[in-house]
Amino acid sequence: MFEKAFTLAALAALVCPALCAEWLTDFEAARQKAAAEHKPIIMDFTGSDWCGACMHLHSTVFEKPEFDAFVKDRFVLLEIDCPHGDKMPEEEKARNEALVTRYAVRAFPTVLVLAPNGDVTGGFLGSGFSMEKIQQELQQGLDNFARLEHAQSLAGQEKLKALGEFYNALNNDARPCAVSLEEQIIQADPQDTLGFAHRRQVEQQRQQIKKRTLMLMQRRDPQEIMATVEELKPTVMPENMHMLLEMKMTGSVLAAQSEDDLAKLRDSLQAELDTLPDSPEKAETASQLKATFSDIPHLFYQVKAVRARKAQEEKLMQ
């Protein structure tokens, strides 16, 4: 029995290299192989010693025969591991961390489909998907590879328009990672006829406001919050005014002295929100406003509790 099991294990070890998908670990080597074979790359950002979702994705998808059969002759596979431990040489770890920055990776696992030149053509975040769903996303990235090649083959305004349409058609997981393609479009469009430069400015300001908001929430000082609102108001782009309104809502709620103050504040904020142009962000702010003021007595109770806790913290620090 032991000899039979040993023989089967040995046979599997011999057969697997020929059948199992090969994952490269060097970005430039993967690009060269993809260019030589005219294939897109599947690039998996993983954390092999800490990311449970990454391990789940590997065990339930990447290590399955169905996945091997799907990617065979279609893709070059590339694993970018970002371990927390010291099992990886520092030089390789630095290269991988640079790729995390280059592709604006914001969650693990992130799986991207790339053209051989490194441009993003598709991808997905997370691990809670079926094999069928993942194959659909990867197939979309493969199909987009051909579309991107066509767009790159054009010239002038026709090329610019095609690249813009390609970028906008990327799914919500892949689009933020397509930093290089976005930069190509911006550089080719100095008059910003497609609005990409403006959109980037809006997003950059949005991230700056988020950082300020996080710091303000830690201190929970209504006067500081309202002062920040006044400071930012002259420079905030119209697309980001909803964020200023949310900040104002937080500061004003913390400053409220009665339930009547909160009721008046609700009406004032709603009137201000009504002046903003319709957008998905405005709709989210409207939902947040409604939820915040849905139970004013309970909200005022929470405000008093925050004040009491803050006063206690300040007393302990004296």
Go through each PLM region and give its residues.
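Oxidative protein folding and maturation machinery
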Residues: 154-318
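Sec-dependent N-terminal signal peptides
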Residues: 2-15
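Loop/turn elements at helix/coil->beta-strand transitions in domains of secreted/extracellular proteins
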Residues: 37-41, 73-79, 106-109, 116-119
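Short domain-boundary/entry signatures in modular proteins, especially
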Residues: 136-153, 205, 209
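Extracytoplasmic/secreted cell-surface and envelope-processing proteins
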Residues: 51-54, 87, 121-122
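Non-catalytic, surface beta->alpha helical segment in thiol-disulfide oxidoreductase systems
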Residues: 60, 98, 102-146
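Thiol-based oxidoreductase modules, predominantly thioredoxin-like and allied folds used
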Residues: 21-25, 47, 60-94
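Local sequence-structure signature of Cys/Sec-based thiol-disulfide redox active-site neighborhoods
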Residues: 25-67
